[in-house]
């Protein structure tokens, strides 16, 4: 085996070689039989003309003999020369930097003067010329080759050719090229040196006159290769960064490629360092390393990557390495090559040629060996550059790119929803069976592009809406005046298309003609050049102007885009569309453009208005109508019927039938005036079916009256002829909008004295008024009540058609009215949460005139909250709406306005009351959403006997406090009990918490039961003649029964 000699070997002269001076033309040099030693240890070590241990002994003797004959040895570097002229020329340029001499073990000392071997110089000034075939060579020997020997080559000196640049091999670089030792990537091994058969003809080397020019070209090539290696390393790092989040579809392959890339990076770093240290060395392994690092995609031909000065040099292919013409069409330098296209492979990268690692960058169903370069280019042509997914067609890639851009170009013409594909839009259109599908609505996305830069219509950017245009309508607009944005922006796209800051001025495209609804996207104009998809994929790059490239440009411009067009300029919240943004702005401005023409309530959206209009719709043919037994007036609500009967009994309503048109109002009845000037009267049939707490508290009340609510002592007047006008809207705090109707007393306010309406105010009601006023200061701001008058008995318009809603309406009005001492409203039920109210009521009369002057300001209406002020004044919490704030305030005040009419429990919200109703479970089959409960047990107690009423309730409650005609009292109770017994299923329990009262005279009340009066038979109208007579005690001072009772004093099962 070979061994490395000392660092500075000395040439030893042999006795038998002295005196012989005839030059020998050829002495095959020795080389390492184990090629890894010179390749790894010293890249510049000569590995020319290797000899092997397998050569026969006679060949070795011949080699020794040739080396001893006429060899001139340099004393400084021990270089050996065959010619005296070369030896003399060498002496002039020789330095004391000796090469490493590698010899075979069987070789003996070589004489210093006779040896004519090859030149082993490493000097950059004399490579490639010391071991060349000389023209002046004398004798020659025939090329001899043993049949079974492959490593020894004998050259004929007479066949030496003059050096021609066209015959110089790319592997020469100043070294002997006619050798059977080559650097080649071997499969399954990391050995970089391979021995070829001696059949290949040796290549001639350049002459001495071309050495400086060759050295200059080599230096240029080294610089180019260093730059290419650095560029390749940068590309590898960037691809690794992409692979961290892009190659999710092939996780195992991505990890393997990363590991291989890191290994290659280390080897490249070592090679670059070696190139810097051995700049003058021109070894074969170094040359192969340089050539392997040339990006294949940048090699249009076999010599295109070389310096222009090296153009005369041609690449000499051998039997196993052929330069294919398709190298310029390879998709990427990162892709593994087929075996037939292994070109300039590095000895360090032979691991990449393993079969198990060939197909890591391709889909699993495609073999790396079977795919031709042209097929690879077609395969990776439709590859997503963001997630590395490969698609079969360009249209599939476009659809996929929309998942990155977020754009949805297909818009439903009915509802405005957007979709990424036409098929999804067609499927969605089936949801609109009332609209006939128009084939033109499903225009192909590829054909609908904007003029100028070819951006699709749906990729255009919508403008943010102009705030003054918020009040126009609720429909989304496609084009509005832009606010602070270029005029070439358009509307009608997904807000998720563009986010981020504003575009530079040089990326703004010019205005383009109208096409499909708007101009084009900023920053994607024809003058804006974006990186193409698959930056290293050669022909895989989309063609300029294609839809795929535009979509990729859109993804790249997302971070550079303008401010989101659907972002609120006030709170910077991003909405889903322009219409949502417009409705969102109304939360800041307090605007409610949609007003109910019946009750005057305003809403921010048309949908809420439509929902509200269902409250006013009545269908008397379906709903049960209850007729008054006295005047035969029909009611759809039993609560209003009972109030109507109470007014009959109190003399507030004449006992004669009312006019046919109950909507004929007196002059004192205010009309509902809308913002658009339309007026509407409140008819008793247009009663409110359902008033939700959220709707009541969040409503906007349009202003049609300038009257200011007056303090409590000044609004009480007992004129029975005054009209009573009631509005159902209880305006909520915190909303900006015109006030609805200030329902105030139309009678005498100037006298200052208050006549009792029949309900005695005492200290407890005053304190309740005070407490409630402190809890809810904004409750009284728009609602004041008027006295009932026979001329206008439309008080039932405040009540609900259904007992459940009426119960809530009364709970929110009657409790407030009675706690504020407003006795003018005849209330059937007294809403007092029994959980915290326990009042002992004296029988003495306390009028409102006895109120302390210091308490009067507490009862005055508080100023309205301004818009956007939904903050709790006690704890500082903020809420999104006035309804939420109102519910929250009940946690501070302890107010529980929703009371169960069965067990008496009170709740803060209607929803909690609904849930509580389900716990009783009795008679829920006939309940309307759990709130309309029949009271058969109560009817069983009442029966048909008039005396049963007095037996059920205490006498001190039932005994009239004024002189009442016994005939009227007996007839009324008989009628009531009989009617209830007949129509049991139509009686519903609405309220509890107090005992409902039945007035028998003006203001005098008595408790009948916890039920409301349902439909009364016309047969009971016979008592109308007796009831028509007004009571003789109308002028007598009135007394009242207690407002509140203890929680457990009376319970209705």
Swiss-Prot record:
Modification Phosphothreonine, positions: 541
Zinc fingers (C2H2-type) by residue: 72-94, 382-404, 410-432, 566-588, 594-616, 626-648, 870-892, 898-920
Top-level taxon of the source organism: Eukaryota
Glycyl lysine isopeptide (Lys-Gly) (interchain with G-Cter in SUMO1) crosslink residues: 156, 316, 374, 838
Gene Ontology terms for molecular function: DNA binding; DNA-binding transcription factor activity, RNA polymerase II-specific; zinc ion binding
One Pfam family cited in the UniProt record for this chain: zf-C2H2
Any single biological process term in GO: neural tube closure
Keyword set includes Signal: no
Record-level GO cellular component terms: cytoplasm; heterochromatin; intracellular membrane-bounded organelle; nucleoplasm; nucleus; protein-containing complex
Sequence ranges of Polar residues compositional bias: 483-496, 743-776, 788-797
Modifications after synthesis and translation: Isoform SALL4B exists primarily as a ubiquitinated form.
Compartment(s) where it occurs, according to its Swiss-Prot or TrEMBL record: Cytoplasm; Nucleus
Covalent link Glycyl lysine isopeptide (Lys-Gly) (interchain with G-Cter in SUMO2), residues: 156, 175, 190, 290, 316, 372, 374, 436, 550, 597, 623, 838, 896, 932, 947
Region span, Disordered: 1-62, 116-149, 483-546, 694-714, 736-776, 788-828, 1018-1039
Family designation: Belongs to the sal C2H2-type zinc-finger protein family.
Assembly description: Interacts with POU5F1/OCT4. Interacts with NANOG. Interacts with BEND3. Interacts with NSD2 (via PHD-type zinc fingers 1, 2 and 3). Interacts with NRBP1.
Biological function: Transcription factor with a key role in the maintenance and self-renewal of embryonic and hematopoietic stem cells.
Protein name: Sal-like protein 4
Lineage: Eukaryota, Metazoa, Chordata, Craniata, Vertebrata
């Amino acid at each position: 085996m070979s061994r490395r000699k000392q660092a500075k070997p000395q040439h030893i002269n042999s006795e038998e070689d002295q005196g012989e001076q005839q030059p020998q033309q050829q002495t095959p040099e020795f080389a390492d039989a184990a090629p890894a030693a010179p390749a790894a240890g010293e890249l510049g070590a000569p590995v020319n003309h290797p000899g092997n241990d397998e050569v026969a002994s006679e060949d070795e003797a011949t080699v020794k003999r040739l080396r001893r004959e006429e060899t001139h040895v340099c004393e400084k570097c021990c270089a050996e020369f065959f010619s005296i002229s070369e030896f003399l020329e060498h002496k002039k340029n020789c330095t004391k930097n000796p090469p490493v001499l590698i010899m075979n073990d069987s070789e003996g000392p070589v004489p210093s003067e006779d040896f004519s071997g090859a030149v082993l110089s490493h000097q950059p000034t004399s490579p490639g010329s010391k071991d060349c075939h000389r023209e002046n060579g004398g004798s020659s020997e025939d090329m001899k080759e043993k049949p079974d020997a492959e490593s020894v080559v004998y050259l004929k000196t007479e066949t030496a050719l003059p050096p021609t640049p066209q015959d110089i091999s790319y592997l020469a670089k100043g070294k002997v090229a006619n050798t059977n030792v080559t650097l080649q990537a071997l499969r399954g091994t990391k050995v970089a040196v391979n021995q070829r058969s001696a059949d290949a003809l040796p290549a001639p080397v350049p002459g001495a006159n071309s050495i400086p020019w060759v050295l200059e070209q080599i230096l240029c090539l080294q610089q180019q290769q260093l730059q290419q290696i650095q560029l390749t390393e940068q590309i590898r790092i960037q691809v690794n960064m992409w692979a961290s989040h892009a190659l999710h579809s092939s996780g195992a392959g991505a990890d393997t490629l990363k590991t291989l890339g890191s290994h290659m990076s280390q080897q490249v770093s070592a090679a670059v360092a070696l190139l810097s240290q051995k700049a003058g060395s021109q070894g074969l392994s170094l040359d192969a390393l340089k050539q392997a690092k040339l990006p294949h995609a940048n090699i249009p031909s076999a010599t295109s990557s070389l310096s222009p000065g090296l153009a005369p040099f041609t690449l000499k292919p051998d039997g196993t390495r052929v330069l294919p013409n398709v190298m310029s069409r390879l998709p990427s330098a990162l892709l593994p090559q087929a075996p037939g296209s292994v070109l300039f492979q590095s000895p360090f990268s032979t691991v990449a040629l393993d079969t198990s690692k060939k197909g890591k960058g391709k889909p699993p169903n495609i073999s790396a060996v079977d795919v031709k370069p042209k097929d690879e280019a077609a395969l990776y042509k439709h590859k997503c550059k963001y997630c590395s997914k490969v698609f079969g067609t360009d249209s599939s890639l476009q659809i996929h790119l929309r998942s990155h851009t977020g754009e949805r170009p297909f818009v439903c013409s009915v509802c405005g929803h957007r979709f990424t594909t036409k098929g999804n839009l067609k499927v969605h259109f089936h949801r609109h069976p009332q609209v006939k599908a128009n084939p033109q609505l499903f225009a192909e996305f590829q054909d609908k592009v904007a003029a100028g830069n070819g951006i699709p219509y749906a990729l255009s950017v919508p403008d943010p809406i102009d705030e003054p245009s918020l009040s126009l309508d609720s429909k989304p607009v496609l084009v509005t005046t832009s606010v602070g944005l270029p005029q070439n922006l358009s509307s009608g796209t997904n807000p998720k298309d563009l986010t981020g800051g504003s575009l530079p001025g040089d990326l703004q495209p010019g205005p383009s003609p109208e096409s499909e609804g708007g101009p084009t996207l900023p920053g994607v104009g024809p003058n804006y050049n974006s990186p193409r998809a698959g930056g290293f994929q050669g022909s895989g790059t989309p063609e300029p102007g294609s839809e795929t490239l535009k979509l990729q440009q859109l993804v790249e411009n997302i971070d550079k885009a303008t401010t989101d067009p659907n972002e609120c300029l006030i709170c910077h919240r991003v909405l889903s569309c322009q219409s949502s943004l417009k409705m969102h702005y109304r939360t800041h401005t307090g605007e409610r453009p949609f007003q109910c023409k019946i009750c005057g309530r305003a809403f921010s959206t048309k949908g809420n208005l439509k929902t509200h209009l269902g409250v006013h719709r009545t269908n008397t043919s379906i709903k049960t109508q209850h007729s008054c037994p006295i005047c035969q007036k029909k009611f759809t609500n039993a609560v209003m019927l009972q109030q109507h009967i109470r007014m009959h009994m109190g003399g507030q309503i004449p006992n004669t039938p009312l006019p046919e048109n109950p909507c004929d109002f007196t002059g004192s009845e205010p009309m509902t005036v809308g913002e658009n000037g339309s007026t509407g009267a409140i008819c008793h049939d247009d009663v409110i079916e359902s008033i939700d707490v959220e709707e009541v508290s969040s409503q906007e009340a349009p202003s049609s009256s300038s009257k200011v609510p007056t303090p409590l002592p000044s609004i009480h007047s007992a004129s029975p002829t005054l009209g009573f006008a009631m509005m159902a809207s209880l305006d909520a705090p915190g909303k900006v909008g015109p006030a609805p109707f200030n329902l105030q007393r139309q009678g005498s306010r100037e006298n200052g004295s208050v006549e009792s309406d029949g309900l005695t105010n005492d200290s407890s009601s005053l304190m309740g008024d005070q407490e409630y006023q402190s809890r809810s200061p904004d409750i009284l701001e728009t609602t004041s009540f008027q006295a009932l008058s026979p001329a206008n008995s439309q008080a039932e318009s405040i009540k609900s058609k259904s007992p459940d809603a009426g119960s809530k309406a009364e709970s929110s009005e009657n409790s407030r009215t009675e706690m504020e001492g407003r006795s003018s409203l005849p209330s059937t039920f007294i809403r007092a949460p029994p959980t915290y109210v326990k009042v002992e009521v004296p029988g003495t009369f306390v009028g409102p005139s006895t109120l302390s002057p210091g308490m009067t300001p507490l009862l005055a209406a508080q100023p309205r909250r301004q818009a956007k002020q939904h903050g709790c004044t006690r704890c500082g919490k903020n809420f999104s709406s006035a309804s939420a704030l109102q519910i929250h305030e009940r946690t501070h005040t302890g107010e529980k306005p929703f009371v169960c009419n069965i067990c008496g429990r009170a709740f803060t919200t209607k929803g909690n009351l609904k849930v509580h109703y389900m716990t009783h479970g009795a008679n829920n089959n006939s309940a309307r959403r759990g709130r309309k409960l029949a009271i058969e047990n109560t009817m069983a107690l009442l029966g048909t006997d008039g005396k049963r009423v007095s037996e059920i309730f205490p006498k001190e409650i039932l005994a009239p406090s004024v002189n009442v005609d016994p005939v009227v009292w007996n007839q009324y109770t008989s009628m009531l009990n009989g009617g209830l017994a007949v129509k049991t299923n139509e009686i519903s329990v609405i309220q509890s918490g107090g005992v409902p009262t039945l007035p028998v005279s003006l203001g005098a009340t008595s408790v009948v039961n916890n039920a409301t009066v349902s439909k009364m038979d016309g047969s009971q109208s016979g008592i109308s003649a007796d009831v028509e007579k007004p009571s003789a005690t109308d002028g007598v001072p009135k007394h009242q029964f207690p407002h509140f009772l203890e929680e457990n004093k009376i319970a209705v099962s």
